[in-house]
Curated annotation (Swiss-Prot):
Lineage of origin: Eukaryota, Metazoa, Chordata, Craniata, Vertebrata
Protein name: Polyamine-modulated factor 1
Coiled coil segments of this chain: 140-190
Pfam families tied to this protein: Nnf1
Keyword set includes Nucleus: yes
Functional description taken from the UniProt entry: Part of the MIS12 complex which is required for normal chromosome alignment and segregation and kinetochore formation during mitosis. May act as a cotranscription partner of NFE2L2 involved in regulation of polyamine-induced transcription of SSAT.
Length: 205
């Protein structure tokens, strides 16, 4: 009896199931990808879900049927649990595919790794809201100011071009008016000369 008990204790400590190995905590300093961590969380959730809905609780809800058909009840329970796990896994897979979740988590891992190599300290709030607001808003406001200045400069350049065009039009109009006046004066002078010539021709001999 003593030998048998010692063998059982030794065998129980020597081997572990795959589920027990997967649930062991990670060693300090090891990096676990967020994709693997997410999958582990899903698996843990499914295990706890199945544990919460144990066969004992299932039979408590259907005692009379279980008493009449215990084997059928077991098969129904097994099929229900399998379909539930499959349905949840499919839903999660669809969510991961629609949101491109794996790529996002991998990118997040890359960002975290890159941040480890940075020597400068990350931004931290100072505890003074006004100061933090100024430090956060100042770059944006400066950018907006520069954009407005560039827009004003473009508008001023367009206005100068428009003013130059208006002045050129006015000068051209003045030149046309002067030309018209000169032609009118020339025509009037010619008309007077014609009248004088006709008057001379009509004088009696």
């Amino acid at each position: 009896m003593a030998e048998a008990s010692s063998v059982n204790v030794g065998s129980g400590c020597a081997e572990k199931g795959p589920e027990e190995l997967s649930q062991e905590p990670a060693r300090p300093g090891t990096n676990i990808s967020r994709v693997k961590l997410f999958d582990t969380m899903v698996d843990t959730f499914l295990q706890k879900l199945v544990a919460a809905g144990s066969f004992q609780r299932f039979t408590d809800c259907y005692k009379r049927f279980y008493q009449l058909q215990p084997e059928m009840t077991q098969r129904i329970y097994d099929k229900f649990v399998t379909q539930l796990q499959t349905s949840i896994q499919e839903e999660i897979s669809e969510i991961k595919a629609e949101g491109n979740l794996e790529a996002v988590l991998i990118a997040l891992d890359a960002i975290v790794e890159e941040s480890k190599d940075r020597k400068e300290q990350a931004w931290r709030p100072s505890g003074i809201p006004e100061k933090d607001l100024r430090s956060a808003m100042a770059p944006y406001l400066l950018q907006q100011r520069d954009a407005l200045q560039r827009r004003v400069q473009r508008q001023e350049a367009e206005n100068r071009q428009l003013a130059d065009a208006v002045l050129a039009g006015r000068r051209q109009l003045e030149e046309l008016q002067l030309q018209a006046q000169a032609r009118q004066q020339a025509w009037q002078a010619l008309h007077r000369e014609q009248k004088e010539l006709l008057a001379v021709l009509k004088e009696p001999e």
